[in-house]
Design a protein with these regions (language model features):
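Second-shell loop/turn segments in exported
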Residues: 1-7, 22-24, 45-46, 171-172, ...
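Short acidic, glycine/serine/threonine-rich helix-capping segments at coil-helix boundaries
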Residues: 2-61, 273
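Short polar catalytic/cofactor-binding loops
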Residues: 9, 115-116, 286-287
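Secretory-pathway/luminal and periplasmic proteins that interact with or process carbohydrate-rich
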Residues: 42-48, 64-68, 287-292
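Intrinsically disordered, low-complexity
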Residues: 57, 62-86
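Basic/polar, cationic surfaces and motifs that engage anionic cell-wall
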Residues: 70-80, 191-306
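Active-site-adjacent loop/helix surface patches within enzyme catalytic domains
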Residues: 82-248
Length: 306
C-alpha cells in the first residue's frame, strides 16, 4: 500500500478511513489526520499523521470498524457535507475575524481563479495569515499542480467560512452592494502563461497542463488548463449554490457568451461592473485588470449547458 498523508485521496484512503471507523469520503483531510494520530498514540507509534508501511501492517489486520460518534473536536461529520448533486464539500474555516459573520443574502455568484498552486487548504490558510483583512471567497476548488502534475487536490471543493458569512473578493467595482452580496469560488489555477509556457512567477508549466485558446483572452493565448474534474465540480457547485442562495445561474455570464461569444463574454461588461446584472459572473466581467476566469472551451460549454 502506498504512503498516505494529508492531501492524499483515492480508494486507499477509503480503506484507511473504514479501518479507522470514520466516514469514508476518500480524501485524507484534517479529520483523517487526527484519526491517524489517535491510532498512532494508541499503538505507541511515532505521532506523525502519516500512514507508512509499518502503520499499514497494523491497519490491515484490523476488522472494518463501524463508523463511530466521536467528540466534537474530532467529529468527522462536522468537517464535510454532501450536496444533493452528490458533491462532497469539505469545511476548512478561516479564523473568526477573517470573514464577515453576516448573515448576508447573496444575489450574485462569481467565478475566480487563484493564480496560485493546486492546494485549496493552503490557499485558505494563506488568507488566514495575511494582513489584508477579510479577503476571501466562501469556496476554493483544488486542481492539478502545474509543474509536476500532482493531482491530490484535483476537484476537491473546500468551504472557507460558514454559509451566510461573507468575504471581500471583488475589489473596487461600481457597486458596493454587489461586493457585499456575492458568493465566490476560487478555482486553483496559475492562470495565463507566456510564450515560453512560464507562469507569471517564472515556473514552467507541464505540457499536459497547457491549453491554447483559439483566440487570445486579455492578450494571452496560453493558460494553465482547468481540469475536467474542476469543470465538473464547478457545475455541481453552481447548481448547489444557485439553489441555496436563490440566484439564477442562467443569467449573466451565459447570456454574455451567447450574445458576444466566449472571449468578449468573459471580459469587462459595463452593466456587470455597476451591479446591474444579478446572476453568474466572472471576476473579469467587473474588473478591467482581472483575467479570471478565462474562456476554457469546456468551461464555456458547461456554462452554456446550465
Amino acid at each position: 500500500m502506498r504512503m498516505l498523508k494529508k492531501g492524499s485521496k483515492g480508494p486507499d484512503v477509503k480503506t484507511l478511513q473504514r479501518k479507522l471507523g470514520i466516514s469514508a469520503d476518500g480524501v485524507f483531510g484534517p479529520m483523517t489526520e487526527k484519526a491517524v494520530e489517535r491510532f498512532q498514540l494508541d499503538k505507541n507509534l511515532p505521532v506523525s499523521g502519516i500512514v507508512d508501511n509499518d502503520m499499514w501492517a497494523l491497519i490491515l489486520n484490523l476488522d472494518y470498524a463501524v463508523p463511530e460518534e466521536i467528540d466534537e473536536d474530532t467529529d468527522v461529520k462536522a468537517q464535510y457535507f454532501t450536496t444533493k448533486y452528490d458533491q462532497i464539500i469539505h469545511r476548512h474555516y478561516l479564523p473568526k475575524g477573517e470573514y464577515v459573520e453576516g448573515p448576508v443574502n447573496n444575489e450574485y455568484i462569481f467565478l475566480h481563479h487563484t493564480a496560485g498552486n493546486a492546494n485549496p487548504y493552503r490557499c485558505i490558510d494563506h488568507w488566514g495569515r495575511d494582513d489584508r483583512g477579510r479577503i476571501a471567497t466562501e469556496f476554493v476548488l483544488g486542481g492539478v499542480n502545474h509543474r509536476n502534475e500532482n493531482d491530490e487536490y484535483n476537484g476537491v471543493m473546500v468551504q472557507a467560512f460558514p454559509e451566510g458569512a461573507q468575504g471581500f473578493h471583488l475589489g473596487k467595482t461600481g457597486s458596493g452592494y454587489m461586493n457585499r452580496h456575492s458568493v465566490g469560488l476560487e478555482i486553483c489555477s496559475m492562470g495565463y502563461l507566456d510564450e515560453n509556457m512560464k507562469t507569471y512567477v517564472g515556473s514552467v508549466c507541464a505540457e499536459s497542463q497547457i491549453i491554447q485558446l483559439d483566440e487570445a483572452f486579455k492578450g494571452k493565448l496560453f493558460w494553465h488548463a482547468y481540469s475536467e474534474e474542476q469543470i465538473k465540480a464547478t457545475e455541481k457547485w453552481l447548481r448547489y449554490v444557485g439553489e441555496r442562495d436563490g440566484v439564477d445561474i442562467r443569467l449573466g455570464l451565459k447570456q454574455f457568451i451567447q450574445k458576444y461569444g466566449p472571449t468578449k463574454g468573459f471580459d469587462f461588461i459595463d452593466d456587470a461592473y455597476y451591479g446591474k446584472v444579478k446572476g453568474l459572473l466572472a471576476h473579469g466581467n467587473v474588473r478591467h485588470g482581472k483575467s479570471d476566469c478565462y474562456p476554457h472551451p469546456d468551461l464555456v460549454d458547461m456554462i452554456l449547458s446550465l
